[in-house]
C-alpha cells in the first residue's frame, strides 16, 4: 500500500518568514505545526461516495441491500452518528485521528511476513561494473551519498515539498534512518534511534550472511569519504569469505508471530542480543550480494525484482538481509542494485526522493583522493546458534521458499510513449494509466474489480495515505464501450476523456482528505474502541467485496529510471506499480502462482495493448485546437 504522489515540486523552505532567525531544531517543528490537521469528512458525504463506488463492482441486489444498511446506519440519532461524534472528538484530541490507528492496523498488527506481503522493493538502473572492485566502489559512493542526504535530515534543512502549491508533511523523512521494526507476539513496534542522546554512527553491512558494524564517522564527527569506506568494505569482504554460515537474517522473513517467538529465543543470549541491537540501531543496511544466476536480458529485470524483494531464496541472497530494517540497499557484483524497505515508517515517495539524490550523488567524480588514515577493523557481529535457533532458521527457509515459488513478478518497460502523450492530450498521465489498467482487467475478466490506488495525505500533519478507487461507473462505461462495435469512435473518445476526468476528480478529493476509505475504517475502529457491536454495514457482502482489492496499485514517480514493486494484497489479485518517465513507463506487475486465474505476464501484455489502443483512439480523433 504505497503512496501515490503527483510529481512533487520541491521548493525551498521559505513560506514561514522567521526561519532565518530560528535554530535549525525548531525549523521542522514550525513547519509541521503550521500544517492543517486531517479532517473527518461529513458522514453522509462518505456514505454517498461509498454507495457510488460499489455500483461497478456489486450486483444490483447487493447494492439495494447495502443501500438499506447505509440508510439505517446514518439515521438521525443512530449508531453512525454516535461513531462520527466519537471520531470528531478523537480528531480534536490528537495530532492526526488516523495515523496511529493506520500504523497499527495496516502494519504493526499485520501478521503476514513483511517480505513480499508488505515491504516494497526498488530496482535501480543496472550499473556498469562487473567485478568486486566496482561493486565495493559503488557501494562506498552510495553510502557516502546517503550520509550526505542525512545531513539535511539532521540539520532539518530538507527542502519542503509542495503539491498543488500546498506544503507537505515531511515527517516520514525523519523516520527512515536509524530505525527498525521489532517483532511482537500480537503487535510489532518500530524503534527509532535517531533522536536518542547518542544517535547511531554506524551502518550494518552484510556479506555471505555475515553481519558487520561499520562506523561511518570519525571521532570528530566528520563522515568517512567514499575512498575510506571502500577500504573498510574490502576488509569486510575479506573477512567473510566463508560460505557455510547460518543465515540468521532469514528469520526476519517469517510470519510475524513465528518470528516474534524465535526473536525471544535468539536474544536470550547476550552475544546475540548485542548483535541484534547493533543491527536495529544502525543508520541503514548495505547488502553485498552474490551474483544471481545468469538469465536472458528479457528475464533479467524480473529476476532482479525478485532479488530486491526477497533475495532469491536461502541458497542465494535471502540470508543477506535483516528484513525488519527500514532501509536496506542492495548491491550485487554484476551491477544490479536497488533496495528493499520496511513499510511501517514511510510510503514510496520519500524513499524515492532519497534514492534520486543518492543516485545523482554516485555519478559525481571524486575530486580529491582522500588520505588513507588507519581505520579500525569493522566489528563482526557474532551469533551463537543453538539447535533451537537452527530449527527456527530451517523453518523460515522452508516458508520463504514456498513464498518465493508462489510469487509471479514481471517488470515491463513500456517504450511506445511516456507521460508526454497523455499530457499532449491535456489528460492526467496517472489517470490515463489507471484507465488502461481498468481496460486490461476488463478484457481479461469481463468485469470491473475493486481497485486501490494510493493517495498521499501529506498535505496534513502526519498524513499517510487514503484510497483512490479507480473502478467507477465512468471507467466501466468506457471499458465496455471500447470493444463494442455499435459505439462510434467519437463516443469512445468522449467516454475515455470522461473516465480520465472522473479519476482525476477522485484523486483531487482524496488528497484533500475527502475520500471515504479511511473514514469508514475510522468508524469501524471507533466501534471497536467504544465496545459497541459491529455495525451491519461492516458485516455486509458489499463491504467485503469493496475491501478485496483485486488490483492494488501505486504510482511512484522518480527522476531515476527505476521501478518499485510489491506483492498483491489478496491471494487472487495483482500488485501494480509504475513510474511514468517522459518517453517511457516502467511497470511492475505481481500475482501469485497458486491462483490459476491470475498471471502477471498476461496482465502486462493486456496493459500494453490497452495503452496502445487508447493512444490510437485519441490520435484518430484529434482534439479541436482552440
From Swiss-Prot:
Tissues of expression: Mostly in skeletal muscle, less in heart, liver and pancreas, only weakly detectable in brain, placenta, lung and kidney.
Organism superkingdom: Eukaryota
Main location: endoplasmic reticulum
Residues with PTM N6-succinyllysine: 93, 261
InterPro entries the record matches: Carn_acyl_trans, CAT-like_dom_sf, Cho/carn_acyl_trans, Cho/carn_acyl_trans_2
PROSITE patterns linked: ACYLTRANSF_C_1, ACYLTRANSF_C_2
One GO process term, biological-process aspect: fatty acid beta-oxidation using acyl-CoA oxidase
Gene Ontology cellular-component annotations: cytosol; endoplasmic reticulum; mitochondrial inner membrane; mitochondrion; peroxisomal matrix; peroxisome
Purpose of the protein: Catalyzes the reversible transfer of acyl groups from carnitine to coenzyme A (CoA) and regulates the acyl-CoA/CoA ratio. Also plays a crucial role in the transport of fatty acids for beta-oxidation. Responsible for the synthesis of short- and branched-chain acylcarnitines. Active towards some branched-chain amino acid oxidation pathway (BCAAO) intermediates. Trans-2-enoyl-CoAs and 2-methylacyl-CoAs are poor substrates.
Name of this protein: Carnitine O-acetyltransferase
The species this protein was found in: Homo sapiens
Amino acid at each position: 500500500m504505497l503512496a501515490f504522489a503527483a510529481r512533487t515540486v520541491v521548493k525551498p523552505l521559505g513560506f514561514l518568514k522567521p526561519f532565518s532567525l530560528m535554530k535549525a531544531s525548531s525549523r521542522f517543528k514550525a513547519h509541521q505545526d503550521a500544517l492543517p490537521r486531517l479532517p473527518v469528512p461529513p458522514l453522509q458525504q462518505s456514505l454517498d461516495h461509498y454507495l457510488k463506488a460499489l455500483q461497478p463492482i456489486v450486483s444490483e441486489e447487493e447494492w439495494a441491500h447495502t443501500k438499506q444498511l447505509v440508510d439505517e446506519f446514518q439515521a438521525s440519532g443512530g449508531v453512525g452518528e454516535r461513531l462520527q461524534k466519537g471520531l470528531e472528538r478523537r480528531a480534536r484530541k490528537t495530532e492526526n485521528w488516523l495515523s496511529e490507528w493506520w500504523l497499527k492496523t495496516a502494519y504493526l498488527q499485520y501478521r503476514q511476513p513483511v517480505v513480499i506481503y508488505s515491504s516494497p522493493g526498488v530496482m535501480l538502473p543496472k550499473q556498469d561494473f562487473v567485478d568486486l572492485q566496482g561493486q565495493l566502489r559503488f557501494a562506498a559512493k552510495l553510502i557516502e551519498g546517503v550520509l550526505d542526504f542525512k545531513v539535511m535530515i539532521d540539520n532539518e534543512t530538507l527542502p519542503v515539498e509542495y503539491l498543488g502549491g500546498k506544503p507537505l508533511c515531511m515527517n516520514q523523512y525523519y523516520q527512515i534512518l536509524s530505525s527498525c521494526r521489532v517483532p511482537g507476539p500480537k503487535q510489532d513496534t518500530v524503534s527509532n534511534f535517531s533522536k536518542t542522546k547518542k544517535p547511531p554512527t554506524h551502518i550494518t553491512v552484510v556479506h555471505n550472511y555475515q553481519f558487520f558494524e561499520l562506523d561511518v564517522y570519525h571521532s570528530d564527527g566528520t563522515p568517512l569519504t567514499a575512498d575510506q569506506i571502500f577500504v573498510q568494505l574490502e576488509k569486510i569482504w575479506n573477512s567473510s569469505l566463508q560460505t557455510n554460515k547460518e543465515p540468521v537474517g532469514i528469520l526476519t522473513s517469517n510470519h510475524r508471530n513465528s518470528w516474534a517467538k524465535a526473536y525471544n529465543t535468539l536474544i536470550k543470549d547476550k552475544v546475540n542480543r548485542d548483535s541484534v541491537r547493533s543491527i536495529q540501531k544502525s543508520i541503514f543496511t548495505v547488502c553485498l550480494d552474490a551474483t544471481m544466476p545468469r538469465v536472458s536480458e528479457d528475464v533479467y529485470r524480473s529476476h532482479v525484482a525478485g532479488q530486491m524483494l526477497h533475495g532469491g531464496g536461502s541458497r542465494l541472497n535471502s540470508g543477506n538481509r535483516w528484513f525488519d530494517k527500514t532501509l536496506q540497499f542492495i548491491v550485487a557484483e554484476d551491477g544490479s542494485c536497488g533496495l528493499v524497505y520496511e513499510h511501517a515508517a514511510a510510503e514510496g515517495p520519500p524513499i524515492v526522493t532519497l534514492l534520486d539524490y543518492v543516485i545523482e550523488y554516485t555519478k559525481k567524480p571524486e575530486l580529491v583522493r582522500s588520505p588513507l588514515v588507519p581505520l579500525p577493523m569493522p566489528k563482526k557481529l557474532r551469533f551463537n546458534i543453538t539447535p533451537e535457533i537452527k530449527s527456527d532458521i530451517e523453518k523460515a527457509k522452508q516458508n520463504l521458499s514456498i513464498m518465493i515459488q508462489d510469487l509471479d513478478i514481471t517488470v515491463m518497460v513500456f517504450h511506445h510513449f511516456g507521460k508526454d502523450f497523455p499530457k499532449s492530450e491535456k489528460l492526467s498521465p496517472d489517470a490515463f494509466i489507471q484507465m488502461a489498467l481498468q481496460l486490461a482487467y476488463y478484457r481479461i475478466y469481463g468485469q470491473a474489480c475493486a481497485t486501490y490506488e494510493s493517495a498521499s495525505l501529506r498535505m496534513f500533519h502526519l498524513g499517510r495515505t487514503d484510497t483512490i478507487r479507480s473502478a467507477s461507473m465512468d471507467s466501466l462505461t468506457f471499458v465496455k464501450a471500447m470493444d463494442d462495435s455499435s459505439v462510434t469512435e467519437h463516443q469512445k473518445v468522449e467516454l475515455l476523456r470522461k473516465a480520465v476526468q472522473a479519476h482525476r476528480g477522485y484523486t483531487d478529493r482524496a488528497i484533500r482528505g475527502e475520500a471515504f476509505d479511511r473514514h469508514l475504517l475510522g468508524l469501524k475502529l471507533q466501534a471497536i474502541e467504544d465496545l459497541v457491536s459491529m455495525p451491519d454495514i461492516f458485516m455486509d457482502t458489499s463491504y467485503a467485496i469493496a475491501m478485496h482489492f483485486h488490483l492494488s496499485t501505486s504510482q511512484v514517480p522518480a527522476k531515476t529510471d527505476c521501478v518499485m514493486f510489491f506483492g498483491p494484497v489478496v491471494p487472487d489479485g495483482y500488485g501494480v506499480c509504475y513510474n511514468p518517465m517522459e518517453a517511457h513507463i516502467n511497470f511492475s506487475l505481481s500475482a501469485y502462482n497458486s491462483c490459476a486465474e491470475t498471471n502477471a505476464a498476461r496482465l502486462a501484455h493486456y496493459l500494453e495493448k490497452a495503452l496502445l489502443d487508447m493512444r490510437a483512439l485519441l490520435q484518430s480523433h484529434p482534439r479541436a485546437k482552440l
